[in-house]
């Protein structure tokens, strides 16, 4: 790397390298707290292949900046191994005479017993409205948006990775969150331009 230190993610350890030539040594371990799962890294690889870009162009959106102080107080819970289930895709038109956020709560309530639920909204305002609507129904949600304070965002990201039956509500980058036992994904206002990443490669929540 031209004599410079660069950051990387340890994906796996093997007894013998798969490539020939000189290998660089790991000079420093920044954290023992996992920041991704095999499934989330596979998703990142798939998206980068689909958009013909470097995986790091996707990782900068997918994984929030590390906050060391959060990791010091973080206690990882036991992850639930997801079993294979039939994937279904459903388009639902919301009723015009009922608040959209209340209708999303109904969908969450319908699916939360099967596992964790992820709701992606186009902007911060919609995220807050959905979280408020969930709170009225005594449902707690983890918020994941780029506008959050770094500490709060990173803490919620790690909590989503290790909590059971969690409800996560966020903006577009939350689509990559390695949520424990994720079973349901709801994309609110899927035609909104805010679901497009503004930086290259310009992925869309719906496509991911």
Annotate each language-model stretch with its function.
Residues 1-208:
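Accessory, non-ATPase domains that flank or precede helicase/AAA+ motor cores in DNA-metabolism machines
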């Amino acid at each position: 790397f031209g004599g410079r230190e660069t950051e990387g993610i340890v994906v796996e350890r093997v007894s013998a390298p798969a490539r020939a030539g000189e290998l660089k040594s790991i000079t420093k371990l920044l954290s023992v707290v996992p920041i991704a799962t095999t499934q989330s890294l596979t998703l990142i690889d798939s998206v980068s292949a689909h958009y013909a870009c470097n995986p790091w162009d996707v990782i900068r959106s997918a994984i929030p900046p590390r906050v060391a102080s959060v990791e010091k107080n973080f206690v990882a819970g036991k992850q639930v191994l997801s079993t294979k289930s039939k994937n279904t895709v459903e388009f639902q038109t919301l009723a015009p005479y009922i608040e959209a956020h209340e209708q999303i709560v109904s969908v969450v309530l319908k699916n939360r017993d099967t596992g964790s639920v992820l709701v992606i909204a186009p902007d911060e305002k919609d995220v807050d409205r959905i979280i408020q609507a969930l709170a009225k129904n005594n449902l707690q949600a983890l918020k994941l948006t780029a506008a959050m304070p770094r500490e709060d965002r990173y803490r919620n990201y790690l909590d989503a990775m290790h909590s059971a039956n969690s409800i996560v509500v966020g903006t577009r980058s939350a689509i990559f969150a390695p949520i424990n036992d994720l079973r349901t994904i709801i994309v609110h206002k899927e035609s909104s331009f805010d679901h497009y990443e503004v930086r290259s490669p310009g992925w869309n929540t719906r496509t991911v």
